[in-house]
């Protein structure tokens, strides 16, 4: 397993739509293993393939706490079949929008159809934080970031901060 570089906003690569996976083969399994390793190292609770420069419809999620046994979920070609009308708000962050957090409201539950790590079709009824995380990661597959749900002002402030952080990092590296 390899830890890969996570792309950060305002990288235009993050804004593209991801392509469906034709079949879950060894290449896709290696991708999922690398994504999981990258997510744990960051650390984070969810990651979409596009965030590491692979525009495929693959996401990984693990909501287990540090002291708990790992419980990774793998979603290939996820598709939301149903969302609740009731919303829930969580303070969201994102590995591609480092050190920035904001309250985002999303449907509290969702039903998702997907292929698992072994390519088997599954359906999951998710609620609460898991539902929010699935929807957040699936947004990445459409080129959408959580900051797109914020006011123009809040979004522009965050993007300016990220650009400044990036420039400062480049100065340090060079």
For every predicted segment, state its role.
Residues 1-135, 140-174:
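Active-site rim/adjacent substrate-binding subdomains
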């Amino acid at each position: 397993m390899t830890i890969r570089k996570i792309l950060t906003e305002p990288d235009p690569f993050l804004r593209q739509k991801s392509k469906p996976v034709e079949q879950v083969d060894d290449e896709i399994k290696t991708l999922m293993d690398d994504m999981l390793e990258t997510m744990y190292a960051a650390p984070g609770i969810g990651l979409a393939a596009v965030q590491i420069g692979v525009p495929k419809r693959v996401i990984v999620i693990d909501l287990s706490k540090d002291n708990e046994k790992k419980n990774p979920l793998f979603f290939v070609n996820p598709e939301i079949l149903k969302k609740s009308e009731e919303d829930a708000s969580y303070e969201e962050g994102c590995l591609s929008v480092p050190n920035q957090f904001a309250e985002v409201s999303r449907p509290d539950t969702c039903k998702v159809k997907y292929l698992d790590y072994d390519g088997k079709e599954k359906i999951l009824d998710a609620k609460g934080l898991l539902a929010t995380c699935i929807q957040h990661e699936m947004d990445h597959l459409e080129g959408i970031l959580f900051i797109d749900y914020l006011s123009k002002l809040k979004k522009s402030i965050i993007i300016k901060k990220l650009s400044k952080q990036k420039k400062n990092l480049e100065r340090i590296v060079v």
